[in-house]
Regions:
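N-terminal interaction/assembly modules
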Residues: 1-87, 107
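Transcription-machinery-associated regions
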Residues: 2-3, 90, 134-137
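Residue-level detector of well-ordered alpha-helical segments, enriched
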Residues: 21, 28, 91-95, 125
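Short acidic alpha-helix initiation/capping motifs at coil-to-helix transition points
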Residues: 70-75, 101-102, 122
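Mid-sequence acidic-hydrophobic segments that form the walls
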Residues: 81, 99-102, 132, 136
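Short amphipathic alpha helix immediately N-terminal
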Residues: 87-105
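Helix-turn-helix DNA-binding module
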Residues: 102-118
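DNA major-groove recognition helices of helix-turn-helix
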Residues: 122-136
């Protein structure tokens, strides 16, 4: 975790390891989105190894569908937690989602993108988000 300070354990009741887990979980969001967009086919070329092989009998389409559902649920968990953290301030949703899913994101970078709040409020919302996320995963 590059220069990311964990939450205050007294205030939020989660350890630095729980925070680290939530932080790392959210950073996987772009990977999930990319995989969800690219893995749509079960057709693969056979691998010729010269070794005899057995067919597993598994259903590749069902396996892919299950994996895609799992990825979508993980993404939905992050998105729902961001929605809950921002509350009535819906304009903050896209900025907080981008912030928590981008490694190395800073408030200064978000300010250049036009974030509609000030630093103190944003970091308070971010801390609340990580608190909620740590409780959900």
């Amino acid at each position: 975790m590059p220069n990311v300070r964990p939450l205050n354990k007294k205030k939020y009741g989660i350890s630095k390891h729980a925070f680290g887990t939530a932080y790392s979980y959210c950073l996987q969001y772009p990977e999930w989105r990319e995989e969800l967009g690219s893995r749509t086919s079960t057709v693969k070329s056979p691998q010729i190894t010269g070794m005899p092989g057995a067919h597993s009998g598994s259903d590749a389409t069902a396996n892919l569908a299950e994996h895609r559902v799992e990825l979508r649920e993980k993404m939905q968990k992050v998105e729902d937690t961001v929605r809950e953290a921002v509350g009535d301030n819906k304009s903050l949703y896209e900025y907080l989602l981008e912030y928590v899913t981008t490694e190395g994101a800073t408030f200064h970078w978000m300010k250049q993108k036009g974030i509609p709040c000030e630093r103190t409020y944003f970091y308070e919302t971010r801390r609340y988000f990580y608190y909620l996320m740590a409780k959900r995963i």
